[in-house]
Design a protein with these regions (language model features):
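Hydrophobic/aromatic beta-strand patches that form the interior of the parallel beta-sheet core
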Residues: 108, 127, 159, 188-190, ...
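Catalytic core of tubulin tyrosine ligase-like
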Residues: 240-245, 253-257, 262-439
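Conserved beta-loop-beta/alpha segment of the NTase-like Rossmann-fold superfamily
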Residues: 184-284
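Generic detection of intrinsically disordered/low-complexity segments and helix-coil linkers/edges
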Residues: 17-18, 250, 396
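Short, flexible, glycine/charge-rich loop motifs used to bind or transfer phosphoryl groups or to couple energy/partner
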Residues: 96-98, 234-235, 263, 318
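N-terminal glycine-rich phosphate-binding loop and ensuing alpha1 helix
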Residues: 3-188, 196, 207-225, 229-233, ...
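Residues immediately flanking
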Residues: 111-112, 249, 332
């Protein structure tokens, strides 16, 4: 036994994980090295603690106190209603446009998820979502960034977080499409970390083969550590980037680098700004932003009883109205502060079915939804909210900005998202004076127009032809 092994063996014994070495003697040297490397990177004690905590039912008193203390979020910029509101939004837009012109904005797309609900066999960004063409999610975002760059004569770096599950294919896809003409040197792919799944009953780390732990991406909260370890926080600082526009891979109608959102964020010197939309019903399965003891936090829909979800404040408005669209703007220095102590973002436990190799070396694929065999661990980026000293919430226009692709069918599916893209296109065309029947699909590339005003102007000048849409 070499000294590395004896050290590893001690740690494994102490944390009841010796089964990881069960097949060590049967492995090739490189497999042995790889297994020891995976074990070396794993915080065995922390995993043990988390598993132990997961076997208690948590602290229902703390959870109940959190919900009782929750108030409607305080600092919210609402959608404009009055002329004064419109003036405020106009001013914020001008401030945001200036930040863009000055080159202070970068986009971060988190694209490391496994997209299991959609059931698409490739990274979700490669999903064809165009109502008339096979335009993918990646292409829509790339074209939005290119169009913003052209409009403001500026550089907007694009940072894409991938994972073991999505990296190689994403890289090949972007190469094959020549980075959609953004220039390879301004698109940064970086990989998030991964964490092993644990057997829910025993806390033992699951293995996917004789030499591999059953790993999965460490959640969108893995962004903070991943940015830092890829050296990107330094790079952003060198490029004088101040604002990181964060969004998820699944919403093709997000307004990337939305000048109004950027403007409010910059005006208020917010460290973390979040776009929210009004929930359609209290029962809607959406996390909501609230104020808890003076801090902004997210309450997950699963934390609320139906009665709590429908609770109203003194103005008769739902307390839990402000649905999280996962569109955020981070102040770069705030991200640096988070990265300096990454343990500030807690690990969350989710019970899921995870395939694994049993003690005889055979693969088992549990599939009982009522009794998941494993716990998976993830960090959530929105846990940064209560850490921030200065947060801001801006209400977005739901039908325009939030039409995600989550499920294979039904709500939040390719059908609803494609229909939204067509509807938005029809609205822009109507504003330009062209009526299109409701059942006719419309697809407007961000390179043709980023909004209704631009489309009107370009149709008038002939730069865009009706026949092309
Ligand atoms: P979701 O919570 O929708 O998860 O991710 P998912 O993995 O994409 O899909 P399901 O739940 O398996 O169906 C929201 C966003 O966070 C990213 C996803 O790529 C998506 O943009 N994400 C999620 C990561 O980048 N890494 C992760 O580890 C998890």
């Amino acid at each position: 036994m070499n000294p590395i092994n004896s050290d590893v063996r001690d740690r494994l014994t102490e944390t009841s994980q010796t089964h990881l070495l069960r097949f060590l003697s049967e492995l090739s040297t490189s497999e042995q090295e790889s297994l020891l490397h995976q074990i070396g990177k794993t915080d065995l004690r922390l995993l043990r603690q988390i598993w132990k905590a997961s076997t208690n039912d948590g602290s229902p008193i703390d959870a109940a106190a959190r919900i009782t203390a929750a108030r409607s979020p305080g600092k919210v910029v609402r959608q404009p209603v009055s002329a004064a509101d419109s003036e405020r939004w106009k001013q914020a837009t001008q401030v945001g446009e200036n930040e863009l012109r000055e080159g202070r904005v970068a986009v971060i797309t988190v694209a490391g998820g496994q997209g299991s609900r959609l059931g698409f066999d490739h990274p979700k960004g490669m999903f064809p979502i165009g109502p008339k063409t096979d335009r993918t999610l990646f292409q829509i975002f790339a074209e939005q960034i290119l169009a913003r760059r052209q409009r403001y004569h500026t550089a907007i770096p694009w940072l894409i977080m991938t994972s073991d599950a999505t990296h190689a294919e994403t890289h090949t896809f972007l190469e094959e499409h020549n980075y959609f003409n953004l220039g390879q040197d301004s698109v940064y792919l970086f990989q998030q970390g991964s964490l092993p799944a644990l057997d829910a009953a025993s806390g033992r780390i699951l293995m996917s083969s004789r030499s591999e732990l059953a790993l999965s991406p460490d959640g969108h909260g893995g962004l903070v550590a991943a940015l830092a370890s890829a050296g990107l926080l330094n790079l952003l600082s060198q490029h004088n980037i101040r604002h990181l526009f964060y969004h998820q891979i699944d919403n093709p109608t997000v307004i990337l680098c939305d000048p109004a959102l950027l403007g409010f964020h910059a005006q208020q010197r917010s460290q973390l700004t979040t776009n929210v939309v009004r929930k359609e019903s209290p029962a809607e399965r959406m996390g909501v932003l609230v104020d808890i003891n003076g801090r902004t936090e997210i309450v997950e829909y699963s934390e609320l009883t139906p009665e709590q979800a429908a609770c109203c404040d003194e103005n008769g408005e739902w307390i839990f109205w402000a649905g999280n669209t996962a569109i955020h703007i981070f102040d770069r220095e705030f991200l640096e502060q988070l990265a300096a102590d990454e343990s500030q973002l807690p690990l969350h436990v989710a019970r899921k079915n995870v395939g694994f190799m049993d003690d005889r070396g055979e693969i088992v694929r549990p599939d009982d939804p009522a009794n998941p065999n494993a716990i998976k661990l993830e960090k959530f980026i929105f846990d940064a909210l209560p850490i921030a000293e200065r947060t801001l919430i801006v209400e977005g226009n739901r039908s325009r900005e939030f039409n995600p692709v989550k499920n294979r069918s039904g709500a939040d599916s390719p059908d609803t998202s494609r229909a939204a893209l067509s509807r938005i296109g029809r609205e822009w065309l109507a504003a330009a004076g062209y009526e299109v029947p409701a059942d006719q699909p419309v697809e407007i590339s961000p390179l043709q127009a980023l909004d209704a005003e631009e489309l009107t102007a370009r149709l008038k000048s002939g730069a865009v032809r009706l026949a092309d849409l």
